[in-house]
C-alpha cells in the first residue's frame, strides 16, 4: 500500500497525527527533499528505507513503490504542505491504478495556511473578500489559457501566489494589470512556520523592490489583497441581531 501524506508547511509538529503515525509504521518513505523538513524523518523506524525524490524522476519514484508492493511493504510518499496543491500526485496515482496498487491520502496543512498564521491574518474578511485565489505565475511550466496572473488579478480578491518568488518583477507587473493598485497591501512569507521564517509586509507597488532587497529568491509565498489592511465588516454570525440554528438573535 502507498500512503500519500502531507508533511505540513515546515514545523515538524504541524504534521497530522495520522501522518506521523504512518511515518512511524511504514517500511519505506519517499520524501520531497527540496521542501520537506528532514526532522520528520526522525519518526521513521531504524530499518525504514528512505529516498529523496528531489534526486529522482517520476519513473524512479514509481519503481520504488512497485518494488515495495511486490515485497508486501508499505510506502509513504511524503509531500510538502498538502499534496493536493502543486503536489504532482495525480500522475503517480495513475501509475498505481494501472498496476493495481492500492493507495490513500492523508491531508496536510498547506503553506498558504501557514503563511496566514505567520501573518496573523484572515483571508476571507467580511466586506473585503470572500474569495481566495490560489495560483502561480507562468514560467518554465505554462498555465492554461485564461489562468494568466493578470487575468486572475482582475477579480481583486485575496490572492495567494505559489512558486513565483523568482519571477517577482513579472508578478508585480501582472498584478498591476488587474484590479490591484500600487497601494494594495501585499506580503511575502519565506519558509512559513520554519525556524528561519521571514515576513515582509509591503504594497503591490513596492513588492518587487522590497523582495529583492531582502534577498528572498525561493521557498516563499506571495499574498495580496485588502485583507491585510485594517478595514473590514463585523461578521453576521456572531452579531447579536443575527439568528442562527443555535441562537436566536434580536432580529428573525
Describe every region a protein language model picked out.
Residues 1-109, 114, 208:
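Class I S-adenosyl-L-methionine
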Residues 42-43, 118, 174:
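Residue-level signal for well-ordered alpha-helical positions
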Residues 2, 60, 71-75, 131, ...:
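A contiguous loop/helix-start segment that scaffolds small-molecule binding in enzyme catalytic cores
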Residues 84-155, 198-201:
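Class I SAM-dependent methyltransferase SAM-binding "motif I" and its flanking Rossmann-like core
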Residues 31-33, 79, 136, 163, ...:
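Short beta-strand/turn micro-motifs composed of small residues
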